[in-house]
């Protein structure tokens, strides 16, 4: 029965992101069947942006929030990219986490920066995006300790597959 159960699982696991679910789809195209979990929309903030542009982007994120055909349409996620300034990155993550009903995606490959950012906003259950073949063990430890989702990068599909396989072997 376990083998049958495994064979009938959707090709992509369902993950919970804030109040939303992603994945768990059994079809690739909407016309094949209805999609089970809707897409989430994200806006990007980056440490490479000046303060005025960051504030303008945050105000724009707040404005995109309306109801259409009985469904709330909004920017559900804020993707915060690290361009090398660790202190500014952590502060930017805090600003993004202060936006209500938004999930923060922490995008950094630097383990120390990731640790500081996750520690600063872990109660908001962000996504830690930045594990790769070189840092996946440390990133996995950070994500597992905080109980959050870990995003993985790879130079190509083969590298991505190998990194994900190593993470699954480690229990993630």
Task: Describe the function of each predicted region.
Residues 3-162:
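Active-site beta->alpha loop and helix N-cap motifs at the rims of alpha/beta catalytic domains
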Residues 158-172:
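Active-site/ligand-binding-proximal alpha/beta "capping" segment
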């Amino acid at each position: 029965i376990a083998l049958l159960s495994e064979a009938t699982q959707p090709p992509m696991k369902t993950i919970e992101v804030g109040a939303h679910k992603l994945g768990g789809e059994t079809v690739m195209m909407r016309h094949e069947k209805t999609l089970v979990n809707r897409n989430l929309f994200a806006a990007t903030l980056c440490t490479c942006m000046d303060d005025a542009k960051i504030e303008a982007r945050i105000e724009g994120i707040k404005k995109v929030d309306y109801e259409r055909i009985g469904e709330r349409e909004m920017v559900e996620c804020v993707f915060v990219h690290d361009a090398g300034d660790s202190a500014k990155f952590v502060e930017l993550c805090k600003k993004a986490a202060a936006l209500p009903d938004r999930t923060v995606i922490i995008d950094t490959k630097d383990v120390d920066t990731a640790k500081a950012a996750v520690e600063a906003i872990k109660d908001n259950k962000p996504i830690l995006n930045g594990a790769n073949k070189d840092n996946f063990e440390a990133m996995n430890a950070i994500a597992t300790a905080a109980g959050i989702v870990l995003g993985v990068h790879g130079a190509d599909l083969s590298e991505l597959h190998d990194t994900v396989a190593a993470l699954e072997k480690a229990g993630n």
